[in-house]
Amino acid sequence: VYGLGVDAKNEIAVQKLYNLKKRPRKKPLILFLDKSTKIAKFVKKIPLHSLKLISSFWPGPLTVIFETILKEPFSLVTEEGKIGIRVPSHPVAQQISGEEDIIFATTSANISTKPSAKTAEEIPFEIKREVDLIIDSGKTPLGVESTVVDVTTYLPSVLREGVIKEDRLRKTLEDKVNILFVCTANMCRSVMAEAIFKKIWNDKKNQKIEVKSAGTSALSSYSPTSYTIKVMKERGLDVSSHLSRPLTKNLVEEADIIFTMEKTHKYHIRNIYPFAQNKIWLLKEFSSGREEEIQDPVGLSEEHYRKTAREIEEEIKKVVEKIDGKQEGQKTLLG
């Protein structure tokens, strides 16, 4: 449906929007982002089940409610400290969402409780005469509001059923979550990451998850480097039977989230498989919100391998903490 959007930092514009919609001040707006990796700047946790929803329905008509790290602006944050985020698929919304220095807060272009507009002509006159700009993109392709899902409880709950129906959400969430670690040759860093993640996650067997690794320039069926095997053995992990695996379209398609070690890996995957751009993260980007790389220890000393393993383990612990949404929560619509 057609929407209204403002820069959430512009208090005058925000107040004008609320007045035009006759919208209660305690009802926040929805944050639009042009890509999912930007959510790290706004949320405390990205629960495991939300990864499946994000990979399946973003960009698209799904709004996800997260616990936020923000205290303000009031127009985006609920009294309970939650925020609604969506990555839209429409090119106009995508372009505006990607503008620098704008926090794009949105809502439907209607008076509160009234039907939403499917064309520019259906936008109420009292809204049309007050807004600064109307972008007429013709009739909306879907004509229905986004589905809203709260993932802040142990089991996600549907707050509003829209384009994406509850049965489809339920079916999606029944599938296991697939995590893929990627480096260059799949003989060092991604091997370490896969093994370390599995070890740390081992006590959470009630949640269906599959972890794999691959390399952007890997050859098939090569063993890890001797130093990789040694430093993993020092951690009680045996990776000697691991065989290197090239990155393939099938691996990318089945993954719900892809962690890369370097920006070149991220760009490589995005360029060859553009459909996957919303599920590719630098490992440190997801864990800590930093666009920093984990360098390749190949050709360096055994101690460099130990340093790399420690670095990866530190980030993996943060990842597990971030996706482990296990907490007390009431039975929900998807429960």
Where are these regions (language model features)?
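Short helix-capping segments at alpha-helix termini
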Residues: P24, W201-K208, Y273-A276
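Phosphate-binding/catalytic loops
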Residues: L76-V77, F104, A109-K114, T152-S157, ...
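Conserved beta-strand segments of alpha/beta enzyme cores
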Residues: I103, L133, E210-K212, D238, ...
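Local beta-strand N-terminus motif with an aromatic residue
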Residues: V131, A255-D256
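Active-site-adjacent structural elements in enzyme catalytic cores
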Residues: V1-V182, L333
